[in-house]
Amino acid sequence: EPYRRQRQMCIRDSITGLNNWGEYICRLFTIDAFFLNEDRHMHNIAVLMNGKGDYKYCPVFDNGAGLLSDTTMDYPMEQDIYQMISEVKSKSVSQNFDEQLDVAENLYGQNLQFLFTKKNVSDIVNNADTYPPEERKRVELIIYSQMNKYKYLFR
């Protein structure tokens, strides 16, 4: 298994010419942990290729499963958000967001900082008036909770 993974990494690097995969994955894991995106998997980790065959890392995409957004089945509105936050499981390398983020940061360093403030969050959430007030408040509380948990990610 380790040999197979090492070989896959060598093939990937030689095909794309990109050699900062660890940092890229670490950024994805940071975003996923912070926003509680439980649906990161190998089909939404990608690279882009232009018409000349040059590759670059893909912008982060497919975060629709974040912020306890499945309110019909997994994370009902009437349940305690702090309890649900503690129960969210990642689907990428480990089921534990903190465990996979710790491993990635230990291997590749912390290479992502967030620059937004609680006021920024409040302003954005309050302006999202297409959503009901209780959903907006829930998102705000989730993000505030994550900001407190991951203080080291903010400048």
Which residues does each PLM region occupy?
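Conserved kinase catalytic-core helix
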Residues: 19-40
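Single conserved hydrophobic/aromatic residue that forms the stacking wall/gate
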Residues: 1-13
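C-terminal catalytic region of ATP-dependent kinase domains
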Residues: 20, 36, 52-155
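Hydrophobic residue at the +6 position relative to the catalytic HRD Asp in the kinase catalytic loop
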Residues: 45-47
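A generic fold-level signal
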Residues: 2, 23, 40, 52-53
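Single, functionally critical "micro-switch" positions that shape active/binding sites
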Residues: 3, 31, 38, 43, ...
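Short N-terminal edge-element motif at the start of the domain
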Residues: 12, 18-19
